[in-house]
Regions:
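C-terminal amphipathic alpha-helical interaction region
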Residues: 1-160
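Conserved small/polar residues in nucleotide/adenosyl-binding loops
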Residues: 162-168
């Protein structure tokens, strides 16, 4: 009413502006969800599973080289990592699938405002949960195997760029 009273925007223009903002928000979350799902399924889970396989092979080799009690002691950490990788990759897969289904439901909503709310309430929390487990896998998987830049590498590059900009 205030915008209309001073001739800035009509109610219809204000509603249209909000509609665009809601649609933009939804599109950004859609893109983020698709990219995260793709990265999780096509990069992160395969790399984590390969590392897990390497750990399993290491455990079997320890068992063939050492007496049972020593092999168990030497392999304990690897067995913990194997289980953690299995738990985290299963969680990621289940939640990526659930997120895809939640997106399908949200995408059927006609109102851009209601669709944005659905994305905020269901998709964003799923993204955060998936991301948490991916971050934990990033810390576990061998650096040589991890195909994506790690946070510390991005931070280091960012710091280098920042310091070189400051020097110029």
């Amino acid at each position: 009413a205030m915008f209309e009273a001073i001739g800035v925007m009509t109610k219809k223009e204000l509603e249209a502006r909000n509609e665009v903002k809601w649609e933009t928000y939804t599109k950004k979350i859609q893109i983020e969800a698709r990219v995260l799902g793709d990265l999780a399924m096509n990069h992160i889970i395969p790399v984590a599973t390969q590392y897990q396989t390497d750990l399993i092979n290491n455990v079997y080799k320890m068992q063939s080289l050492f007496p049972a009690d020593k092999a168990a002691r030497l392999s304990a950490k690897n067995l913990e990592l194997i289980e953690e990788i299995a738990d985290r990759t299963a969680f990621i897969k289940e939640h990526v699938d659930a997120m895809i289904e939640a997106r399908k439901v949200a995408n059927k909503i006609e109102s851009e405002r209601e669709k944005a709310i659905a994305y905020h309430d269901t998709i964003v929390p799923a993204l955060e949960e998936i991301r948490y487990h991916i971050d934990k896998l990033e810390l576990i998987v061998d650096n040589q195997m991890w195909t994506l830049p790690k946070y510390r590498e991005l931070l280091f590059v960012s710091c280098l760029l920042y310091t070189s900009d400051a020097a110029d």
